[in-house]
């Protein structure tokens, strides 16, 4: 072959790279993720039923969905069309809205009610509530109801006592206290008496509107991306009616007394259909099915309308005191399960890629969604991948709204930042149970601090190189840089493999922790010559990954957490660090010169002022100033609240150290005092006070009989004699010391 012709080229063999696999509840195993339409992903997420404050159970789902969504979009590069619903028509909403309205009216009128009438009402409330307590079989809920009953009774006793004492001011206070303590039982009693009289639709609209706004505010505070499309049930009633009609036309639903029910057994008999795909073991679980029907839809007359106890409502005939919409079957409202089916199908059609929701919704809600949707389209599959987030417990205990054992999102945000909450979720599998506890949050807080210290160090160590000597960022590449680069590359491989494996963020963060630890060792061992470009590459990669995970908001490309300290949208403002740091740096340099001069002159008052600037003034401005050996220093912009917490923790640790020192000092003094007191005891009297052990003594004070009158054994007598002899020696020393004095 002529040398003037190019030689044959050997193509590299492609390496095996992991593919994204997701745990699919429809198969109960991890499956390769293959969208229906190339790189485009259609995704429907179950949204909230808006009748109360959002709590950490909601956060468990929506933060986890947001993490999954961001990673699929920003890491794996899928084009995601994300739809979420708002359930604003529901039995819970109807009942809560009615009860709130009636209670507010009653509370406003109660100030003018004669006391005997108020107390008469109280007796009726008590009887009804006692019936509720008696019917309840859940032990945890029974405890909660009993506590409510006790508080209500205590409030009544306090009110009647104030009346008997003629205390007018006390009566007004105790009356209000009773209303506060007995709010739920009173509202339940009022609903039973007057609920059917409520016919103003505004009552049923204002409650969900208010709580929907609060929900969106909570999601924004948690740095959760808004959906691309938001569907409200109240705006989809015509589409829901049409969807139900399709199921009837396909012979799998039937009307009864102005309601419409899904024919579960008829559906399951069809060859292409399968009821309860997610939880087949639950087929026939009428208790769960009834819970899914709603509080206002399980009366005996409603249940008797069904052909089978397995059937569930697609359309509910509205009774007096319930909102209604027109339909071919009469005035009513949609059933809970049909709402999501109709809305998702209106946006996506007969099939879509991903459906997400909490694990507690698997049966009956999601199984019913699947059944009625497949019945409407006469297809065997409506959703390809069903992803369910795990339960959330509160310090190891089951969280339950009915038990009033829940932490609202706003309450959680008062204790921890949105970043810390998200890190807590990232450090756990999205599909497993997460325990929201002090230990969990401490783990997240420490991880955040660990990363933040690394980011601050990298920025401080490389800042001067970039601004003053940019050539030094390309320092010679030695074995230590090669080793860190190798660790960096292997960590990227580990992170990718973890994210491909069912979006395992916990393992990804473990790999990041190891990479940061290796980088910290590199910094420690190579202070005289650091490759700033390599360090910044590592820090930028980790920061970018945290952006992808939603733990950092704002534009990508920087290093570290935003100076505001949060993951929320406030962090997305201008580059505060670039703007402020030059001024802070100048102040720090001036302080350093003053400090060095003060040391030379032994001007301790000036040194104290320099320390005060470092320890008290700058932290209040979000600036951490660190004095280092050799007259050097480091300036770091940190979230002000974090710095103040650090300072408080440092002061608390110092106070505890001082207290421990004082405790030890007092213990030594007490031991010395006890020893001195022991020396003063006459050996003949040392056992006489131990009457709980002995009942008789000889002329030398030695015990002869135990407390039961039995003679002391010879072996025991010898031990007591030895103790007495030792005391005799101490006593002689004491007497001698007195004579010398």
Swiss-Prot record:
Cofactor note: Binds 1 zinc ion per subunit.
UniProt gene name: Aats-cys
Binding site for Zn(2+): 46, 340, 365, 369
Top-rank taxon, per record: Eukaryota
Residues binding ATP: 401
Keywords noted in UniProt: Aminoacyl-tRNA synthetase, ATP-binding, Cytoplasm, Ligase, Metal-binding, Nucleotide-binding, Phosphoprotein, Protein biosynthesis, Zinc
EC number: 6.1.1.16
Catalytic function, reaction form: tRNA(Cys) + L-cysteine + ATP = L-cysteinyl-tRNA(Cys) + AMP + diphosphate
Keyword Metal-binding part of the UniProt annotation: yes
CDD domains for this protein: CysRS_core
Example of a GO cellular component annotation carried by this entry: cytoplasm
GO biological process: cysteinyl-tRNA aminoacylation
'KMSKS' region (motif): residue ranges: 398-402
GO molecular function: ATP binding; cysteine-tRNA ligase activity; metal ion binding; tRNA binding
Motif ('HIGH' region) on chain: 48-58
Identification of the protein by name: Cysteine--tRNA ligase, cytoplasmic
Localization of this protein: Cytoplasm
Listed InterPro entries: Cys-tRNA-ligase, Cys-tRNA/MSH_ligase, Rossmann-like_a/b/a_fold, tRNA-synt_1_cat_dom, tRNAsynth_Ia_anticodon-bd
Protein family according to the UniProt entry: Belongs to the class-I aminoacyl-tRNA synthetase family.
Species per Swiss-Prot/TrEMBL record: Drosophila pseudoobscura pseudoobscura (Fruit fly)
Modified residues (Phosphoserine): 297
Keyword presence, Nucleotide-binding: yes
UniProt-listed HAMAP family: Cys_tRNA_synth (MF_00041)
């Amino acid at each position: 072959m002529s040398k003037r012709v190019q030689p044959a080229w050997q193509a590299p063999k492609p390496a095996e790279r992991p593919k994204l696999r997701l745990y699919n509840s429809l198969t109960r195993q991890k499956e390769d993720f293959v969208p229906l339409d190339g790189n485009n992903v259609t995704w429907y997420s179950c949204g909230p039923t808006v009748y109360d404050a959002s709590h950490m159970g909601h956060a468990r789902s929506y933060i986890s969905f947001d993490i999954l969504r961001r990673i699929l979009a920003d890491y794996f590069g899928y084009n995601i069309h994300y739809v979420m619903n708002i359930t604003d028509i529901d039995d819970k909403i109807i009942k809560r809205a009615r009860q709130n309205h009636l209670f507010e009216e009653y509370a406003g009128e109660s100030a003018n009610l004669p006391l005997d009438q108020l107390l008469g009402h109280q007796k009726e409330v008590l009887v009804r509530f006692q019936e509720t307590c008696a019917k309840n079989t859940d032990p945890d809920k029974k405890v909660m109801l009993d506590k409510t009953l006790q508080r209500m009774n205590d409030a009544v006793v306090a009110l009647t006592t104030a009346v008997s004492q003629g205390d007018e001011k006390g009566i007004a206070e105790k009356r209000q206290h009773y209303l506060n303590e007995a709010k739920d039982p009173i509202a339940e009693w009022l609903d039973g008496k007057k609920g059917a009289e409520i016919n103003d639709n505004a009552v049923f609209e204002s409650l969900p509107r208010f709580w929907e706004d609060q929900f969106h505010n909570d999601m924004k505070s948690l740095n959760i991306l808004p959906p691309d499309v938001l569907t409200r049930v109240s705006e989809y009633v015509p589409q829901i009616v049409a969807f139900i009609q399709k199921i009837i036309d396909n012979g799998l639903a039937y009307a009864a007394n102005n309601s419409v029910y899904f024919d579960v057994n008829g559906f399951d008999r069809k060859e292409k259909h399968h009821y309860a795909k997610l939880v087949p073991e639950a087929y026939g679980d009428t208790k769960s099915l009834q819970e899914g029907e709603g509080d206002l839809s399980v009366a005996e007359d409603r249940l008797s309308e069904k052909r089978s106890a397995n059937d569930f409502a697609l359309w509910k005939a509205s009774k007096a005191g319930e909102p209604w919409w027109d339909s071919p079957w009469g005035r009513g409202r949609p059933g809970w399960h049909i709402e999501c089916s109709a809305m998702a199908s209106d946006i996506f059609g007969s099939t879509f890629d991903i459906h997400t929701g909490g694990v507690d919704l698997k049966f009956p809600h999601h199984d019913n969604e699947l059944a009625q949707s497949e019945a409407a389209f006469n297809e065997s599959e409506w959703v390809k991948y069903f992803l369910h987030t795990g339960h959330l417990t509160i310090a190891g205990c089951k969280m339950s709204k009915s038990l009033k054992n829940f932490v609202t999102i706003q309450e959680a945000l008062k204790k921890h930042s949105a970043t810390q909450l998200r890190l807590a979720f990232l450090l756990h599998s999205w599909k497993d149970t997460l325990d929201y506890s002090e230990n969990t949050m401490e783990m997240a807080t420490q991880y955040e601090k660990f990363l933040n210290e690394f980011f601050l160090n990298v920025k401080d160590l490389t800042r001067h190189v970039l601004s003053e000597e940019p050539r030094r960022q390309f320092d010679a590449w030695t074995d230590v840089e090669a080793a860190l680069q190798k660790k960096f590359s292997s960590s990227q491989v580990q992170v990718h493999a973890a994210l491909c494996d069912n979006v395992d963020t916990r393992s990804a963060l473990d790999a990041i922790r190891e990479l940061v630890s290796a980088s910290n060792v590199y910094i420690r061992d190579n202070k005289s010559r650091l490759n700033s470009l390599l360090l910044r590459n590592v820090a930028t990669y980790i920061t970018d990954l945290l952006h992808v995970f939603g733990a950092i908001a704002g534009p990508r490309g920087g290093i570290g957490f935003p100076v505001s300290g949060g993951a929320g949208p406030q962090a997305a403002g201008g580059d505060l660090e670039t703007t402020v740091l030059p001024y802070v740096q100048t102040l720090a340099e001036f302080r350093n010169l003053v400090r060095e001069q003060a040391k030379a002159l032994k001007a301790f008052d000036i040194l104290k002022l320099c320390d005060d600037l470092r320890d008290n003034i700058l932290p209040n401005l979000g600036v951490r100033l660190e004095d280092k050996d050799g007259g050097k220093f480091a300036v770091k912009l940190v979230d002000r609240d974090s710095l103040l917490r650090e300072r408080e923790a440092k002061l608390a640790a110092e106070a505890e150290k001082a207290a421990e020192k004082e405790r030890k000092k007092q213990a030594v003094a007490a031991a010395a005092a006890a020893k001195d007191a022991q020396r003063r005891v006459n050996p003949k009297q040392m056992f006489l006070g131990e009457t709980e052990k002995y009942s008789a003594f000889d002329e030398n004070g030695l015990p002869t009989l135990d407390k039961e009158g039995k003679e002391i054994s010879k072996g025991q007598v010898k031990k007591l004699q030895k103790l007495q002899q030792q005391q005799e020696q101490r006593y002689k020393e004491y007497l001698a010391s007195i004579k010398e004095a």
